[in-house]
Swiss-Prot record:
GO terms for molecular function: microtubule binding. The gene is spef1. It comes from Xenopus laevis. This is Sperm flagellar protein 1. Microtubule-associated protein involved in the stabilization of microtubules along the axis of migration during radial intercalation. Promotes the establishment and stabilization of an axis of microtubules required for the active migration of cells into the outer epithelium. Microtubule-associated protein that promotes microtubule bundling and stabilizes microtubules against depolymerization in response to cold shock. Essential for ciliary central apparatus formation which requires both its microtubule-binding and bundling activities. Radial intercalation is a developmentally reiterated form of migration by which cells move in a direction orthogonal to the plane of the tissue from an inner layer to an outer layer. Residues 178-229 are annotated as: Essential for homodimerization and microtubule bundling activity. Residues 122-169 are annotated as: Disordered. The keyword Cytoplasm applies. Homodimer. It holds the Pfam family CH_2. Residues 123-136 have a biased composition (Polar residues). The Calponin-homology domain mediates its binding to microtubules. Its main location: cytoplasm. One of its GO terms (biological process) is microtubule bundle formation.
């Protein structure tokens, strides 16, 4: 294996795959994952709505295997900001040792990254809902204060003046809130654009890394074969 993919990482990957229920017995990972079906099942385990299993046909033929991986690349992996290069796919289809492990390890990282982003998004939504609930309670409080003021309490207040004050306060609060939301939305847009740029660069680097690792594996195996002769 390449230097970047040590034995400990390999074992962690196998342990991770073993925790996921798959439709076939786990025998030889290079052959088991060569047609892309189990890779699709693996992603579906974490993101059920992301994968439609009828698109992936169990296959022994190279043509069908390539078709499965092409669909998987386009419809699923791309949504995880991940793409497997064509020459790497060909090596997976040919059951080249050590290649599918590199892809699965990167896929595992992408799945974990998407899960983290999902949790962050859920937390932000919850915070926004909490803030909205707080604003609703404040509005009720203002109405309550308005109804409690009465001539019986010794204070004669012009109803038109009181109403005007209430509207002015509400308008100021609403303007401030809109301004804050606009600032947050602008910050979020800028952050999303930055993330997209970084993800594009990361995808390119990951593809280059996969290609390099596959090349190193090939050279290592050839060297070992020469040493045996």
């Amino acid at each position: 294996m390449a230097v970047e993919f040590d034995e400990e990482t390999m074992q962690e990957l196998y342990t991770w795959v073993d925790t996921i229920p798959l439709s076939r017995p786990k025998r030889n990972i290079a052959r088991d994952f060569s047609d892309g079906v189990l890779t699709a099942e693996l992603v579906k385990f974490y993101f059920p709505k992301l994968v439609e299993m009828h698109n992936y046909v169990p296959a022994n033929s190279t043509t069908q295997k390539l078709s499965n991986w092409t669909i998987l690349n386009r419809k699923v992996l791309s949504k995880l900001s991940f793409s497997v290069p064509d020459d790497v796919i060909r090596k997976i289809v040919q059951c080249s040792p050590g290649v599918v492990e590199l892809v699965l390890n990167t896929l595992r990282q992408k799945i974990e990254e998407k899960q983290r982003l999902h949790h962050i998004s859920a937390d932000l939504s919850q915070d926004q809902a909490t803030q909205n609930n707080g604003n609703t309670h404040s509005d009720k409080g203002y109405k309550s204060n308005g109804t409690e003021l009465s001539p019986r309490q010794g204070a004669r207040v012009d109803p038109a003046s009181k109403t005007h004050q209430g509207y002015a306060q509400a308008a100021n609060a609403d303007t401030t809130l809109r301004f804050q939301l606009a600032e947050k939305e602008q910050t979020l847009i800028l952050s999303q654009e930055t993330i997209q740029i970084l993800q594009a660069k990361l995808r390119r680097l990951e593809q280059l890394l996969l290609l390099k690792n596959v090349r190193i594996d090939d050279l290592t195996r050839r060297l070992q074969e020469l040493e045996k002769k």
